[in-house]
Design a protein with these regions (language model features):
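Membrane-interfacial helix-loop segments of redox and metal-homeostasis proteins
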Residues: 1-211
Length: 211
């Protein structure tokens, strides 16, 4: 029901389903940390030409142009998929948040991984800060509703699948070198490996939503 960022946002809104999913995420990251400790590695990154690193950003720009200047791409007319901020506000907000996330090296899986392997809580502190800020916002605006049926949040209480789904995300994130947010940031920095990972996430999400 969402990436680790979405999970934390749901947690801050009082959604107990997200807290259940956190169990799976921590266990998945722990399993990945165990694999790293026992020698798992995808090898060292190597510099390539700049053109390969620009493929995904150019592709994303093309999708943005198609979404705003044509009717080729379909958009949801009802349900949660139809709710979004104005395009300009989304771009400005995304640029600000993306810059802060890049500078702080924000990574949800990395924070737990570093805490387990190196007893380093720097990245985890950033995640905790985000949670506290959003918790205060939700409390101040009356959006905080504690329970398994939080208004405005599309969720289910099938706890086994919540745990297993986020376990897979946590495990894969550690092996790939970063959570979905971190992969998106690295792809924007020019990482071809992360670009392939992001494309894989898009493809898998499309399969899950359409079949």
């Amino acid at each position: 029901l969402g990436c680790p960022l979405r999970m934390v946002l749901r947690m801050s809104a009082g959604d107990l389903n997200a807290w259940v999913a956190l169990i799976g995420f921590v266990l998945g990251v722990g399993t990945g940390a165990f694999a790293l400790k026992n020698g798992f590695s995808l090898g060292r990154a190597h510099e390539t030409n700049k053109e390969s690193g620009a493929v995904l950003p150019v592709l994303m720009l093309g999708i943005l142009i198609l979404a705003t200047c044509s009717t080729l791409l379909k958009a949801s007319e009802a349900g949660p998929g139809s709710f979004h901020a104005p395009i300009i506000m989304s771009l400005i907000g995304g640029l600000i948040f993306g810059a802060l996330a890049q500078k702080s090296r924000m990574c949800f899986a990395g924070g737990i991984r570093d805490a387990i392997l190196m007893k380093n809580f720097d990245l985890l502190t950033i995640i905790a800060g985000l949670f506290v800020v959003m918790l205060i916002f939700n409390l101040a605006t009356g959006r905080f509703v504690l329970g398994f049926n939080t208004p405005g949040i599309i969720a289910h209480s099938n706890h086994l699948w919540n745990i297993l789904g986020m376990y897979a995300v946590g495990f894969a994130a550690v092996l790939a070198g970063g959570c979905p947010l971190r992969q998106l940031i690295l792809a924007g920095q020019g990482s071809s490996d992360s670009a392939v990972t992001v494309l894989g996430m898009f493809f898998a999400a499309a399969l899950c939503h359409n079949f």
